[in-house]
Amino acid sequence: MDWLAKYWWILVLVFLVGVLLNVIKDLKRIDHKKFLANKPELPPHRDFNDKWDDEDGWPKKDQPKK
């Protein structure tokens, strides 16, 4: 088991290469054109930032300094 203490990083690299190959293989199976053709319509995004747009605390650029 002395070799495992010395070369554990090789096992980690082999594992990561295997994960990377599986990810690439799975991503090749995805048909992005079919997904984009049948993409569901998203509802409009509601946020309440429009209330704060008028209450901007930044000074105006055209105002002279006091």
Swiss-Prot record:
Annotated region (Disordered), positions in chain: 39-66
Signal peptide feature range: none
Residue spans crossing the bilayer: 4-24
Locations listed in the record: Cell membrane
Family: Belongs to the UPF0370 family.
Organism whose genome encodes this protein: Salmonella paratyphi B (strain ATCC BAA-1250 / SPB7)
Taxonomic placement: Bacteria, Pseudomonadati, Pseudomonadota, Gammaproteobacteria, Enterobacterales
Record's keyword annotation contains Magnesium: no
NCBIfam families in UniProt: PRK13664.1
Keywords attached to this entry: Cell membrane, Membrane, Transmembrane, Transmembrane helix
Name assigned to this protein: UPF0370 protein YpfN
GO CC, any one term: plasma membrane
Biased composition (Basic and acidic residues): 42-66
Gene name tied to this protein: ypfN
Coiled-coil spans in chain: none
Membrane disposition: Single-pass membrane protein
HAMAP family on file: UPF0370 (MF_01566)
InterPro entries registered for this protein in UniProt: UPF0370 (IPR020910)
